[in-house]
Amino acid sequence: MINCKRIWAAITAAALCISLAGCGAASSSSAASSEAATVESAPASSAAAQEEAASPETAATGLRVAGLKGPTTMGLVNLMDSDDGANYTFTMYGAADEIVPLLVKGELDAAAVPANLAATLYQKTQGQVEVACINTLGVLYIVENGDTVQSVADLKGQTIVTTGKGTTPEYVLRYVLSQNGLDPDADVNIVYCSEATEALSQVQAGQATIAMLPQPFVTTALSQVEGLRVALDMNEEWQKVAGSQLVTGVLVVRKDAVEADPDAFEEFLNGYAASVEAANTDLEGTAALCETYGIVPKAALAQKALPECNIVFERGEQMKTDLVNYFQVLYDADPSSVGGAMPADDFYYGV
């Protein structure tokens, strides 16, 4: 068996040699901002990680779990570092689309991924995967260099710089605006940037005062721009109008992996739940592990960001309710964002 700690050590060594070595805006934003938009940029380590995940020796071990840098994997690190973690193979990838073919081919068993990607995988595999739990709620925040915005209504007539045009951040923003009586095309000027760093640079230069950004990039931005503050938590604003939680990430799993040993999978989920609890109570220890495993570039950044990343372990009926409502909003905006159709009931594990 290949011990997961050795796998992660190799991946981390490569990852920390590249841009993650610093804690500046560019390095800290790449995981969170792109994760919110469903796709992440691949680091130099991704090829090695993919090769490790697909090797015959790795395939012979227990559950093979993939993760991405950023909030969707932060809740897993305590399990990864535990003695029980040696029973599983954890591999980190630089981009969500690297994980898709491996899950489809059965070279991975489970993955912590953006929620809408899980729905797309369900369609792509003709129902061969299911969602086991929600691991991350909303990570989007409206920040302002000023004190004008106290409610969504205050965004009328304002310019908002953000990322993710044609992806989930756009759909979330437009939904919250419209449900608060604002026309996203007439009442607000939304300027889309290619990266969160570009959006922040406009705020820094005084070209804009309001931006919608993801964690943990928000934490870095607050330390870099004097007077910048969190004006609105988009998770809270979503709850007000949707009556459910805004979802960012989930754990998706192949049904055949669960059926092969249902008790073992439940044991994994129990360990996952304990790991999430530790992530929310032992911030310092979890933050250190996030740096060790290359999930967040610096422990100090992770420790500040963790309370705002809305890391959860939600399963069962509540999971289904939150996901169905979330997927419906995405489907109404663009059916392809959830794979072209709403997932059927068999997509929701244990419900």
What is the predicted function of each stretch?
Residues 2-26:
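Sec-dependent N-terminal signal peptides of Gram-positive bacterial secreted proteins and lipoproteins
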Residues 22-35, 39:
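Bacterial lipoprotein signal-peptidase II cleavage site
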Residues 37-42, 51-185, 190-192, 209, ...:
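Short, glycine-/small- and polar/acidic-enriched structural segments
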Residues 78-79, 140-150, 245-264, 315:
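A bilobed periplasmic-binding-protein/Venus flytrap-type ligand-binding module shared by bacterial periplasmic
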Residues 83, 236-244, 311-320:
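Short, solvent-exposed loop/beta-turn-alpha elements that line the ligand-binding surface or hinge
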Residues 116-117, 198-290:
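Pocket-lining segment of extracytoplasmic ligand-binding domains
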Residues 258-333:
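Secondary-structure end/capping motifs
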Residues 324-351:
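Conserved C-terminal helix/tail region of periplasmic/extracytoplasmic solute-binding proteins
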